[in-house]
Amino acid sequence: MQDFWHAASAQLESELTPQQFKTWIKPLTPLSFDEQACMLRIAAPNRFKLDWVKSQFSGRIQSLACDYWEMQVDVQFVLDPTAGQRQAAMQPALAPMPMQPLAAQTMQAQAVPREAPARPTMAPYRETPMATAAHAAADIDVPVMDAAEASTQSYRVPAPAAPAVMGGLSAPPAAPVDDTVHERSRLNPILTFDNLVTGKANQLARAAAVQVANNPGKSYNPLYLYGGVGLGKTHLIHAIGNFMLMENPRARIRYIHAEQYVSDVVKAYQRKAFDDFKRYYHSLDLLLIDDIQFFSGKNRTQEEFFYAFEALIANRAQVIITSDTYPKEITGIDDRLISRFDSGLTVAIEPPELEMRVAILMKKAQAENVTVPEEVAFFVAKHLRSNVRELEGALRKILAYSNFHGKEITIEVTREALKDLLTVQNRQISVENIQKTCADFYNIKVADMYSKKRPANIARPRQIAMYLAKELTQKSLPEIGELFGGRDHTTVLHAVRKIADERSKDAQLNHELHVLEQTLKG
């Protein structure tokens, strides 16, 4: 049986991307093979992986088993019997954190730039007196939601088995959610699973979000989503909240940016209203907290959030967190909080691939009731790779230019509308600039990028530069090879695959690549 699994794993590794193999196949464990019953049993480490492997890979694994034993073999996927031991509840460490003076926190909170103007306060929770008291004491600013924004669209959640398709299974019928519910929760009713474009970059995060929305407090608690700016983290957590509200409009849900949570802690301290503050946050059914990295260095805020987190988990309430980086890479956050973040499911959201970027543009254009030719969408998607917000901004420029000049949207019109943006992109993201940036970063000479030298301190940065050239420019593999001293395209392909595979395993390398990408993108 072990010989079979070794051979099957090798075959699957050659068929799948490194990330797919590492995420789905590597964690599986062959348990037994019954020759009389022709039954192979394979264990998955948790329910999420079990369901996904059964829906996505069971047929291929069964086919490999039949070929190996040269007979019909049934494959049974089960939950790892030792999974429960690994999921044992962590005991809360109640020793107080080092306290930072609240005056200092107040200054830090005020120093953080706010992206949105001050907004009027909305009505507090009416269901519970404690919620009303907390709102009054903390003087929490709640964004106004225009009544026209309350979407009447259906809330359909695609099944995890078909992550690349928008739409799918319908949610159970539910009473309409009125505006005041969204005002209390701070949820944006426009951000749903229905209008989230799904691709390889976010399919795992979306599948986890769907699972949590259907089983709050039971599946993956907390759910921790991380990735760069504009990749859809906020959209996903709003979609979870909106789905839960459709099923239960009386659910106590709160979306809050970490910066606002810091401000609430400061206000509660100033008004001596911590009891009300705690009663409110500890009584929620779902807490959605965005950009948790803003807690860095704010010890009193971390203290209060720790107690809120413990209370919510103990009450089987769901906690969902987003950040721009992996939990253990956040600086200035207490270790016991980091361990809590790591105790659930942590999922990365990557920049969208080409096909997903095209789908996003077409979806956004459809929402604007504008027809954008597919070749235009591909042109934009090929040149803009960073995130969804960048794509949205480019589309707005194209539409504005087209309307102002009274021209149909073509590639020529698009090129003219985006000429400034494309000039910046082409100037910044060139192979030559990548080579210089990598050489400076790793303290080698630019000439080493073209040389035939093979010491590790030179070969490694050169491979990283090749990887970035493939990811961030439009150059083909032969063109990149030519710019790296006339190397063969297979050498470039080897470097790209090697760095891509190691990036998914090596946190330090991933951090270095993130820094280089941000430097190159300006």
Swiss-Prot record:
GO terms for biological process: DNA replication initiation; regulation of DNA replication. Its main location: cytoplasm. Belongs to the DnaA family. ATP binds at residues 230, 232-234. Residues 186-402 are annotated as: Domain III, AAA+ region. Residues 403-522 are annotated as: Domain IV, binds dsDNA. HAMAP family: DnaA_bact. This is Chromosomal replication initiator protein DnaA. Pfam families: Bac_DnaA, Bac_DnaA_C, DnaA_N. GO terms for cellular component: cytoplasm; plasma membrane. Domain I is involved in oligomerization and binding regulators, domain II is flexibile and of varying length in different bacteria, domain III forms the AAA+ region, while domain IV binds dsDNA. It is found in: Cytoplasm. Oligomerizes as a right-handed, spiral filament on DNA at oriC. Gene3D superfamilies: 1.10.1750.10, 1.10.8.60, 3.30.300.180, P-loop containing nucleotide triphosphate hydrolases. Plays an essential role in the initiation and regulation of chromosomal replication. ATP-DnaA binds to the origin of replication (oriC) to initiate formation of the DNA replication initiation complex once per cell cycle. Binds the DnaA box (a 9 base pair repeat at the origin) and separates the double-stranded (ds)DNA. Forms a right-handed helical filament on oriC DNA; dsDNA binds to the exterior of the filament while single-stranded (ss)DNA is stabiized in the filament's interior. PROSITE patterns: DNAA. The gene is dnaA. Residues 1-71 are annotated as: Domain I, interacts with DnaA modulators. Residues 71-185 are annotated as: Domain II. Keywords: ATP-binding, Cytoplasm, DNA replication, DNA-binding, Lipid-binding, Nucleotide-binding. One of its GO terms (molecular function) is DNA replication origin binding.
